[in-house]
Amino acid sequence: LAICDEGRTAPLLVEPPRGVWSRTDILHWLHDRADDSLLVGFDFSFSAPFLDRCAYLPGETDATDPRALWAYVDRHSSDADLGAASFLETRRGRHFYLGAADGVKAHFMHYRRCEQHFNANGGGKASTVYDAIGAAQVAKASFAGMRLLHHLDPAIPVWPIDPPPRRGACVVEIYTTIAARAAGIRKGLSKLRDGEALDLALAAMGSDPHLPMPRYTDHATDAILTAAWLRTNARRDDLWHPPAMTRQIARTEGWTFGVS
């Protein structure tokens, strides 16, 4: 978790209350700041694909909007700390691909409109939440994140399912690769693993150098750089109203802030 104010000062890491951040800790931290002028970026998918098949989990739930999906996932997940690994495991081969025993992987490769648009326009290779295997998979974090959003609701609006509020906090979906590309980091080299590389990326965001850290991890540098990127782009109207995002897409699948 990294946070910054307006201006140029580099984002700072926020110390967790108990050694490492849990989802529950993040949930409580956000509830305490719901009335603050805060733009919050989460790096996970806020919804599963809906429009291609008119269902999130065909044959299982009749949910037609992300909030109904979040509630369904939460109701059918018993994992600690808002986890969702069991939700995926009990549905492997039916909705999720976790390995060769689940069948032909291509049959699970359904994408949201936002991911299709991002991939088709050279942004990279955004993953689908139905693919739950490999280092690039986003399924486990995304369905766990949906549980977090369910418990956060209705304290903080979630864009673009909700319009941006006139005051108070707002949550958006982010993709750290977008921030890395904006900082001039080439494809395949998105991770920053030392202070010098982080400062070069921050400079591209109009930010001052960061305070040195005892150790550099992908999670820490991603959080710092993406917080700076959000600050730089928070007032860009084209990112709040991307031409490819229709009202139907926003209502059923959401969108990633930064995909234009």
Predicted regions mapped to residue ranges:
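RNase H-like (RuvC/DEDD) metal-dependent nuclease/polynucleotide-processing core
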Residues: 1-39, 44-260
